[in-house]
UniProtKB/Swiss-Prot annotation:
Residues 1-28 form the signal peptide. GO terms for biological process: actin cytoskeleton organization; actin nucleation. GO terms for cellular component: cytoskeleton; membrane. Residues 114-128 have a biased composition (Gly residues). It comes from the Eukaryota. Belongs to the formin-like family. Class-I subfamily. This is Formin-like protein 16. Residues 396-849 form the FH2 domain. Residues 60-73, 295-310, 847-866 have a biased composition (Low complexity). Residues 46-59, 174-185, 270-294, 311-383 have a biased composition (Pro residues). The lineage of its organism: Eukaryota, Viridiplantae, Streptophyta, Embryophyta, Tracheophyta. The keyword Translocase does not apply. Residues 186-196 have a biased composition (Basic and acidic residues). Residues 463-474, 677-697 have a biased composition (Polar residues).
Amino acid sequence: MAPAPSPTPLPLFLLLLLLVGVAPLAAAQGQNIQTRFPSTRTPAFATPPPITSPSPSPGTPTATPSSSPPSSSGKRSDIAVAVVSTALSSFAVSGLAFFLFLRHGKKRELTEAGGAGQHYGGAQGGALTGKRPEREPKRPARGNMVDENGLDAIYWREFEKEGDGGRGRKPPASRRPPQPPPPRPYRAERRQDAHESSAPSPPRSRKNRIDQEPLIPRGSLDSASAEFDESLYAPSAGSTSSFSVAAAEAYARPPSTPAITAVSSVPRSSPSPAPAPAARPASPSPSLPLPPGRESPSRPQSIAAAAVASPAPPPPPPPKPAAAAPPPPPPPKAAPPPPPPKGPPPPPPAKGPPPPPPPKGPSPPPPPPPGGKKGGPPPPPPKGGASRPPAAPGVPTGSADQQAKLKPLHWDKVNVAATDHSMVWDNITGGSFNLDEGIIEALFGTAAVNRKTKPADSKDASGGSTSAGLGRSNSPEQIFLLEPRKSHNISIILRSLTVGREEIIDALLNGHTELSTEVLEKLSRLNISKEEENTLLKFSGNPDRLAPAEFFLLRLLLDVPSPFARVNALLFKANYAAEVAQLKQSLRTLEMASQELRTKGLFFKLLEAVLKAGNRMNAGTARGNAQAFNLTALRKLSDVKSTDGSTTLLHFVIEEVVRSEGKRLAINRNYSLRRSGSLAKSTDGGNPAASSTSQGPSREERQNEYLNLGLPIVGGLSTEFANVKKAALVDYDTVVNECAILGNRLAGTKKLLETYGDDGFARGLRGFVKAAEQELNELKGNQEKVLELVQRTTEYYHTGATKDKNAHPLQLFIIVRDFLGMVDQACVDIKRKLQQQKKPTPPPSSSQPAAPAATTKGAADDAPAPAQKPPEEVDSKRKRVMPRFPNLPAHFMKDNADSDSSSDEE
């Protein structure tokens, strides 16, 4: 409700100005009046005078007129001076009266607006009257001036004025929530109430703005904004109450120093600060009344309780901007409060989570703290002052006799009451999570364990079971006729099948092969003994009560005669083709491996080199002069090292064979070298220099050339013996017994078909049995042939090896496979050695002859020593004749070696 408009002093000011200004003029027109100015100084102007020229000093009275009459010009000037002085005096007096009336009206306006004048009206009015106004407000404050915590500052001013005698004035019965005021409500109210068509003079407004001091920094949140009011009076349910957080400071702060945040900037008198209240003893005071608009009278008592424990500090300084106040330390959390103090509350000790209310009193339960705790009054505080929940969460409230006994959970308990700091368990409440005790009793109760063991013990003689006293539902129990573990395994197999029971029965009755091999293999694992079949067939109860495994087996036995024999027959038919193909492949591998060992001449040369080297090393001993040796000695060649340890007997033998093969290849294929030599002889015409040049490289270079040519040939031996390596991996027992196994299974299937006569299953398998019988007969003949070839090959390399019962029948292939691997590694080592020896050397200069060294090396050869030639001609000839070979990998083939050598020759 807007305050009643006060009478404006404007008409009175105009009337007074007219009377004071016109009266002297009217009196001065009829007579010559001597004007005397008052000796006192005029009061200071609130605004600068419009005329800047100095006026005559009013302090000195004018002289009395002389006896002689003045001139006309002197009279006119005296009259003008008198008029001007009178006008200025009138304006000064009128202005002073105007400002007095305006100040009085403003003070009255602010007082009627809700007591706001007690703050800044006392500061300004005190400068004029020298005392604080004591005028009572006619109606409650509008709520447009709040402190930094969102509380009504005018309410606290009124509370201070009441003193220690009582609880203060009662708040109004109903208080409308504050609406968002305009940006400058004070200036708007002044213009509306005073009915001023024009704003006050700019100099006076500017002065007031300069003298005032903003209470909050510019750009910060306006406490009178709509967002602040909504959060103050309508807090959200999920967040901590704004009253419980912000009012803890407001109720504990002295009323003389509220941090007021007004809607508009409030002027304050800088020379006369607000009087600080006298220090009051920290005596208990009655509970504080609730500000207008609050819901529960118990909340202020619970919030201001933490401020009583500490003594009242000295009076604080005049109010400063709210942003500059440092945050005080937080109070002890949830400390039980003593009786509320009397008198105004002391300064705020802390800013943080509010403590819980005192445990005594008829007030409703306090608001929950930030942790979200709920429950009754807290127990006596521990040493640290932190309250703990009265009971552990999850503990049932019933008696021990009514609770079911559960399995124990072994853990170490923690005494949260003995800690002096907050813990995570403080945030756990009894109502945040509800435990379903029925489920936990069913899962972990001892009665549930006993119920699981009773069905096996309660079987009767007929295979059924009783459910009396078990506490189970009315659903029929499953009957287990087999061993429980076997029944469980069969149930797992049945659940993994991808076909239904009817399809399985149809395939077993008609001999269809639509069932996959995987399904047939799983069905073959369901085979049970005769005793178990008799137990299932003797069951005369309801089949629907049987367990899944027993039910399936009983249906299978009743619908299909000899079901597991039929499953084995169908499985044999499904696997027959793959097993026969694998057997044929193994026989073919053994046959080709035997042929490779009989026809490859390079392997013979390796054996010859080993034999000669062994005889040379064993000369003069009983092991010397041997004609043959057991092939098991090939594995020991790498163990015989040279005297200096730089090489082994294996490397020596392989290097000799490589050099021999390279020399043979050089003689047979190096036609370009011979052609170039013959052309050189014909061109030189018998010149000894030319004939010496045609002799080619030295002995060492030729040996290296032979090694480079022979390495691809010897290294490709592993590729030529590929089937020998495969034959070493063949399972000889499988090859020998596979035909017999297939024959026995085929004979059992044939006998089964004869038993069934002419039913669908027999008709479906009769054609397969006939074709398989013929194929197995042919396979047996081929098997005998291949095994005989393997024996002859073994005897070919080692006489009497087949008669050794402890020897492996395929031992020859295994030894050769291992030796070929050693040969490949030796070839790689030789190639690496050649690459290390072949290092680029700078060509000799023309001034230093290098021919004698080359001639000396050439003389060591069997060929006659050629005549010496100039170094330039020898080097050019070597570059033209010397072939180049690429670096070979670890495993190289003969075809690649041939292509490399031919490309080098070209």
